[in-house]
Amino acid sequence: MVPAAGQLALLALGILVAVCQALENSTSPLSDSPVAAAVVSHFNKCPDSHTQYCFHGTCRFLVQEEKPACVCHSGYVGVRCEHADLLAVVAASQKKQAITALVVVSIVALAVLIITCVLIHCCQVRKHCEWCRALVCRHEKPSALLKGRTACCHSETVV
């Protein structure tokens, strides 16, 4: 005999009620202590047999699956951290290259600034320096000498 649709619906409803009652909270005491459940971790240390399991990472033992897993170091991917992550390597390389370029440019700019300050100081305050005179007086126009003015270098005046 084939049951009617109403009977099937009642049967399904009965099963659903039975499952809900089974899953419902009860006032019976817990069999395990709640502290022990909170302390249990999903990972344990890998046994000695798996110390070399991960190529570029740290080994952890999955408690539920009872097998080792790897936490890869930066720049490596794969189940056992066996593959280099090229995108991470390129990004790190570009960052290092940019920092190196910035340091080099800063050092060169600082050196140019220091040399410029020394030259200005020497040529403004101490025009009697031999190398300053050679640098400054070399570019002096003879028109200043012809008009009877004092030249940039103290030793050259027109009478």
Swiss-Prot record:
Residue span(s) of the pro-peptide: 24-38, 89-159
Signal peptide (UniProt feature, chain positions): 1-23
Domain (EGF-like): residue spans on this chain: 42-82
SUPFAM superfamilies, A to Z: EGF/Laminin
Lipidation (S-palmitoyl cysteine): 152-153
Function: TGF alpha is a mitogenic polypeptide that is able to bind to the EGF receptor/EGFR and to act synergistically with TGF beta to promote anchorage-independent cell proliferation in soft agar.
Subunit structure: Interacts with the PDZ domains of MAGI3, SDCBP and SNTA1. The interaction with SDCBP, is required for the targeting to the cell surface. In the endoplasmic reticulum, in its immature form (i.e. with a prosegment and lacking full N-glycosylation), interacts with CNIH. In the Golgi apparatus, may form a complex with CNIH and GORASP2. Interacts (via cytoplasmic C-terminal domain) with NKD2.
Protein name: Protransforming growth factor alpha
Species this chain originates from: Rattus norvegicus (Rat)
Highest classification ranks of the organism: Eukaryota, Metazoa, Chordata, Craniata, Vertebrata
